[in-house]
């Protein structure tokens, strides 16, 4: 009876569904990768460092052909000529193109790790650096989009607050609902801004433009991994 209760519990069912797809597993492995990276520095653990490397490699397998998702998304955003905000549209196009390039170059890194291609200056140094640059440009496009959304939602809130104070009855309730949505949009944009900024902190350290403590870089990865898992959990 207890076993049945656990097996059929909604949370367990949701968790199984969360891990059923490669995207959910990749998010969990990303969290484990950065946790291992943090423990490797904190405890000078060789095992944690080895686990970090293994989690990183497995994630590369799970992201195989994922660039196609971003290319399709970029094409859809580009074709959406009726978008309400062209700044957001352009940022979405650029973000997905750069992420597609980043993930494509990362597949070369996987082939190098598997020793399918030889380790050369190109495959061992230049391509990993180009990959990080594409990741950074994708994040910068995301940051620009986040700031634009914050600006837009803030302007909407100011307008709705003014309209709400002058409305009555049913109209007042309608303005209240719209205002609530505007506040939610602003919160979502602020959350995404923090997320993209934390990931940018990681990649800037990867590129050598920052030389922060390894613990802080690892913790940034842990935080952004949790944010990604939260979004995926809500969508499950």
UniProtKB/Swiss-Prot annotation:
GO process annotations (BP): medium-chain fatty acid transport; peroxisome fission; peroxisome organization; regulation of peroxisome size; signal transduction
Membrane topology designation: Peripheral membrane protein
Record's keyword terms, sorted: Membrane, Peroxisome, Peroxisome biogenesis
Pfam families for the chain: PEX11 (PF05648)
InterPro entries documented for this protein: PEX11 (IPR008733)
Subcellular location(s) per record: Peroxisome membrane
CC per GO annotation: endoplasmic reticulum; peroxisomal importomer complex; peroxisomal membrane; peroxisome
Protein origin, superkingdom: Eukaryota
Family classification: Belongs to the peroxin-11 family.
Subunit composition and interactions: Homooligomer. Interacts with PEX34.
Function: Involved in peroxisomal proliferation. Promotes peroxisome division and biogenesis.
Note: Present with 1630 molecules/cell in log phase SD medium.
UniProt-recorded name of the protein: Peroxisomal membrane protein PMP27
Organism (species): Saccharomyces cerevisiae (strain ATCC 204508 / S288c) (Baker's yeast)
Taxonomic placement: Eukaryota, Fungi, Dikarya, Ascomycota, Saccharomycotina
Gene symbol of the encoding locus: PEX11
């Amino acid at each position: 009876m207890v076993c049945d209760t656990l097996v059929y519990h909604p949370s367990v069912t949701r968790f199984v569904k969360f891990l059923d797809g490669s995207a959910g597993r990749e998010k969990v492995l990303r969290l484990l990768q950065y946790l291992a990276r943090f423990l490797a520095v904190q405890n000078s653990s060789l095992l944690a460092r080895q686990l970090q490397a293994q989690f990183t490699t497995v994630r590369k397998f799970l992201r195989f052909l994922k660039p196609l998702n971003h290319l399709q998304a970029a094409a859809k955003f580009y074709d959406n000529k009726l978008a309400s905000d062209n700044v957001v549209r352009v940022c979405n196009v650029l973000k997905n193109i750069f992420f597609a390039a980043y993930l494509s170059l990362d597949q070369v890194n996987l082939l190098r790790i598997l020793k399918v291609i030889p380790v050369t200056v190109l495959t061992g140094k230049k391509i990993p650096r180009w990959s990080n640059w594409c990741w950074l440009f994708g994040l910068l496009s995301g940051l620009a989009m986040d700031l634009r959304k914050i600006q837009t939602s803030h302007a909407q809130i100011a307008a709705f607050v003014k309209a709400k104070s002058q409305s009555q009855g049913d109209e007042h309730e309608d303005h209240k609902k719209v205002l609530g949505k505007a506040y939610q949009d602003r919160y979502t944009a602020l959350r995404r801004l923090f997320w993209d900024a934390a990931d940018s902190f990681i990649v800037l350290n990867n590129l050598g433009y920052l030389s922060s403590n390894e613990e802080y870089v690892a913790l940034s990865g842990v935080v952004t991994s949790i944010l990604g898992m939260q979004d995926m959990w809500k969508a499950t």
